[in-house]
Amino acid sequence: MSSESQSSSSGPSSSGSKMKDFNQRFRDLHKLRQRARKENHEQVVEEDRRSKLPKNHEAKKERDQWQVKELQDRKAAEDKGLDYERVRSLEMSADVTEKLEQKRKRKKNPDQGFTSYEDMTLRQHTRLTAALDPDLDSYKKMRECVGGEQFYPTADTLIHGNHYPTTAAMDKLTKDVHGQVKRREQYHRRRLYDPDAPIDYINEKNKKFNKKLDKYYGKYTEDIKDDLERGTAI
């Protein structure tokens, strides 16, 4: 009689505890489901936001961050009384510094090769104008010596034979003309050359063809190329 009463008393308690554990697990699963649902929704919203951004947004963002860091480093160097360009050059390797200098020159007056004679003339005018180094002291002295009427001629002013260039000015002109002749003789469309890049072409035409192939199929053949370079069996 006592054993029956004990079994009857333990039965409802065990079933109740099982039900309680089941309800707890169900609530935990429900919370996990709600959390996953929320995170998925946030990711979908973020992907939709990124898809509506310009294609160069990430690159522009990285460039802005790099510019901000450069300004901060430049200010820190100035506060310490150091030359920022020299400090940056010491932190970089020589080849990287050379590439950055070439990139800066191309950005200042980019050479896109021959397009038209008008563009070539404009580039030459821009380069020659940037190379001008006016001597204001000589300018003022010449104006005082010649006088305002002769220095600022009109249609009735005779200026033939009144100008006597200095020796330094003539040397500068001669040097510039010789430089123009040398550049004209050696002119060619400058192409970027990376000495560390792998040589997988036999001529210029084959090089262009390989670039086109790599553009469309490079991601599929990268593993095969690595295996061939290592000598691993395919």
UniProtKB/Swiss-Prot annotation:
Disruption phenotype annotation: RNAi-mediated knockdown results in increased sensitivity to the heavy metal arsenite.
GO biological processes: mRNA processing; RNA splicing
Nucleus as UniProt keyword: yes
Signal peptide range: none
Region listing for Disordered, in residue ranges: 1-80, 96-120
Annotated TM spans: none
Coiled coil (UniProt feature): 19-78
Bias type Low complexity, positions: 1-17
Keyword Lyase: no
Subcellular localization, as worded in the UniProt entry: Nucleus
Keyword terms of this UniProt record: Coiled coil, mRNA processing, mRNA splicing, Nucleus, Spliceosome
Cellular component terms (Gene Ontology): catalytic step 2 spliceosome; post-mRNA release spliceosomal complex; Prp19 complex
Pfam families associated with the record: SYF2 (PF08231)
Ranges of biased composition (kind: Basic and acidic residues): 18-80
Function: May be involved in pre-mRNA splicing. May confer protection against toxicity induced by heavy metals such as arsenite, possibly by negatively regulating the expression of phase II detoxification genes such as gcs-1 in intestinal cells.
Summary of subunit composition and partner proteins: May be part of a spliceosome complex.
Family the entry assigns: Belongs to the SYF2 family.
Protein name: Pre-mRNA-splicing factor syf-2
Organism encoding this protein: Caenorhabditis elegans
Gene name tied to this protein: syf-2
